[in-house]
A protein has these predicted regions:
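C-terminal and inter-domain tail/linker signature
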Residues: 1-138
């Protein structure tokens, strides 16, 4: 395993477990940036903010899990791509409406760009509108 592959795998695991920045920071540059073309993530511009946002999703979606479908390293471009499916049911407090009891299976992709052996930037590709519809949030 390459160093960036190991780092990306560890980051993915702790981020998707909802451990927030305290669990993720060791894998990232302190000022790592974040981007996504998703309304739910508007204004989230740092990886620290994103990992805390992910942590917060476990309040309305307790027991959320993921299935890693693909994981690839591009050594030439110094990035790692992970494709997963996040599954959860809205049973907890939080979210824009009271618990709906509805479930999601949301496809998403992370593209983690490295500077040295740490993540410098991450892009999330995700259809938040579809996810919010599945949950009954829109």
């Amino acid at each position: 395993m390459s160093s960036i592959k190991e780092t990306a795998a560890r980051f993915f695991e702790v981020c998707e477990a909802g451990l927030g920045w305290s669990g993720c920071r060791q894998h990232c540059h302190p000022d790592a940036t974040f981007s996504a073309q998703a309304h739910a993530l508007a204004g989230v511009e740092t990886l620290e903010a994103y990992t805390e946002w992910m942590k917060g999703t476990f309040e309305p979606l307790p027991g959320g899990t993921y299935e890693l479908k693909a994981f690839a390293v591009d050594e030439d471009r110094h990035n790692v791509t992970a494709y997963g499916v996040f599954s959860a049911t809205h049973t907890g407090p939080g979210g824009p409406v009271p618990p709906t009891g509805r479930s999601i299976e949301a496809d998403y992709v992370y593209v983690m760009e490295f500077d040295g052996d740490r993540i410098r930037h991450m892009t999330k590709i995700w259809n938040d509108t579809f996810t919010n519809e599945q949950l009954g949030w829109v």
